[in-house]
Amino acid sequence: MSAPAAGATAGGDDAADRNVEMWKIKRLIKSLELARGNGTSMISLIIPPKDQVARIQRMLAEEYGTASNIKSRVNRLSVLGAITSVQGRLKLYNKVPPNGLVVYCGTIMTDEGKEKKVNIDFEPFKAINTSLYLCDNKFHTEALQGLLADDNKFGFIIMDGNGCLFGTLQGNTREVLHKFTVDLPKKHGRGGQSAVRFARLRNEKRHNYVRKVAENSVEQFIKNDKVTVAGLILAGSADFKTELGQSDMFDQRLQAKMIKTVDIAYGGENGFNQAIELAADTLASVKFIQEKKLIGGYFDEISQDTGKYVFGVKDTLAALEMGAIETLICWENLDIVRYKMKNSLGEDILLNLRPDEEKDKSHFTDSETGQDMEIIETMPLLEWFANNYKNFGAALEIVTDKSQEGAQFVRGFGGIGGLLRYRVDLAHVDLEDELDNIDLDDYSRAAVVSHWAPYSFLLLFKLVSSFFFINLFINYPALSNYNISLSQSSSSLIAISHTTLYSKFLFHFIEFAPRVPHYCRFVWSVDAFSSAGKASHVCQHTEKETFHARNEDAIGGLFNRTKVEARATHSHSMTSTLSLPSVDVSTRNSNDF
C-alpha cells in the first residue's frame, strides 16, 4: 500500500501538485477505511507540527509495557509488533515535519483471509493540527478528511417568480441545501374598481415571499450564531434578488457576506448552474470553476481541430513519452490498471487494461509460446501518472464527473486525455512501430508467388489491353482530338507499402492516361490482407526524384495524414519506353481507383 509523498509544500503554491496530493490522500483514506484486523492491532498515530519526536517515543514505550499485559497471546503479539513498527518509523525522523506526521501501522486481513502487515508514514501536504493515538481493529482517518476540504465555501440563493433554491459550492462539490416553490399572482390590467386591491394583494404576497426567503437563509447559512459560508451570491430574475439584498428582513450577518448579485434566465438547479458560471470571476479559486475552465479549453481545441489535443490510453501514453503533453487530464476514478510482465524471452511487456479487458486471458499469454507471462507489477494507471508525470515535463490535472463538462469528458473520451505543446502526428508514430514489427520472412519469394499466382492471368490481360489501346489511338488519331503521350522514361511505378503485419501489397500500374472522352485509364490495383484500411497514393516523378507518399489511416472515422518521403528509382523490368511527346500524368486519388 502506497502513501502520499512526503514534503509537499504547506502553502500549496502549485495548484496542480496540490490537487494530485489531495487525490493521493483521498485514495489512501478510501483504502484505509476498508482495512480491518483481528483484535486491537491497528495503530493510528497523528503528530501535529512543533511536537517532539522524543515525547512520542516515550509514550510508545509506556504503551509497549501496558500491551505486554494483554492476556490473549495472538492479540498481544500483534499489538506489540505494531508498536515496534511505529517506533521504527519514528526513528527515520529527527524532528516532526513542518506539516505534521501521520503514521498507520498494523496487521490487516486480506480478502483471501490472510494477514498482511501495513506500515505507512507521510507528511500531509498542508498542516494538520490534530494529535491522535488509537489502537483499534481499524484505522481512524477522520482527521485526514479535513485535508480534502477547501477552506472556502460559498452560498447561493436563487430566486425567481416560481420559487427559491439554497445551495453551496465548495471545491468541486456543488450541493443543494433546500428549495421550495411559490404561486405568486401575475400583473394584469383588469379589475376595474378592484385593481388597487389586486395590486395590494400582489405586493403583499411578494413581501411574504421575500420574508420567507430571508428566514430560510438564516436556517441554511448560520449555525451556532456563525455564518458557515465565506461569501454569499444572490441570483435570480426580475427584482427579487435586489429586494432581498436591500430588505431589513435579511440578516445583517449575511448581508455582510454578499459578494455578488447576478441576473439569470432560469430558476431552480439550472439557474444554480448558470449562477456559478456567471460568478466564475469571483469564484476563480474554487476547484469547480477551475475544472470547468480546464475541460472547456480542452473541448475548444477539439472543436477547432487544432491538433493540439490527444485522448485515449494509447495515444495519450505515446504523446507523454514524446514529451509533447503540457497538461495531462485524468478522471479521479479512472479504472485502468497498468501491468508489467515478462515473456519467455525475458522481454518486458507493458499493458494497460480496463476491468472488462482483464477477463480476457489472452492478454496475459505469450503469443509465440502460448505460455502465461510472469506478472512483475500491477498498479492503477492514475497512480503511475501521479508518481511519474513530472518526469515527462507535464502537469497532471485530476478532474471529477460532477460538472457537466467533467461528465462529458468521462463518457465521451474515457476519462483520459491531454493538451499538447505542439501538433503531433500519432498515426506516423504508429506506422513506424508497425514497420519495425514486420517480419520480412513472411514475404518470401515462395509466399508471394503462391499468393499472386491466381492473379497472373488478370495481370497479363491488363498489360495486353493497355498496349492494344495505345496502338489503336496512335494508328487512328481521328478517334480523338487529344494528344496521347507518356511521361519521360518512367511510365510505370511499383509501390509496395507495408502498413501492418497483414500488410498491403499495392501494385499500381499507372498506364498511359490518354485524355479522351471519359478518360480511358488502365489501372490495376490489388489490395491484399486489408485489415487496417490504409492505402498509399504514389505521385509519379522522373528518375531518382523524391516522391511523397500520402498515408491515409481511417480509425474511428478520423483521418490522420502522414507524409513519408522515399526515393523513387527507375524501374526497367516492367516499363516500356516509347518515343512519344511527354505530358503530365495527373496523380490519381483514392476515388480514381
Curated annotation (Swiss-Prot):
Q: Which domain of life is it from?
A: Eukaryota
Q: List GO terms (cellular component aspect).
A: cytosol; translation release factor complex
What Pfam family does this protein match (any one)? Answer: eRF1_2
Q: Where is this gene product found?
A: Cytoplasm
An example GO BP is:
cytoplasmic translational termination
Q: Which UniProt keywords apply?
A: Cytoplasm, Protein biosynthesis
SMART domains the record matches: eRF1_1
InterPro entries hit by this protein: eFR1_2_sf, eRF1_1_Pelota, eRF1_1_sf, eRF1_2, eRF1_3, Peptide_chain-rel_eRF1/aRF1, Ribosomal_eL30-like_sf
Q: Which GO terms describe its molecular function?
A: sequence-specific mRNA binding; translation release factor activity, codon specific
Q: What does this protein do?
A: Directs the termination of nascent peptide synthesis (translation) in response to the termination codons UAA, UAG and UGA.
Q: Which family does it belong to?
A: Belongs to the eukaryotic release factor 1 family.
What does the annotation say about its assembly with partners?
A: Heterodimer of two subunits, one of which binds GTP.
- From the Swiss-Prot or TrEMBL record, give the protein name: Eukaryotic peptide chain release factor subunit 1
Species name for this entry? Answer: Caenorhabditis elegans
Gene name as annotated: erfa-1
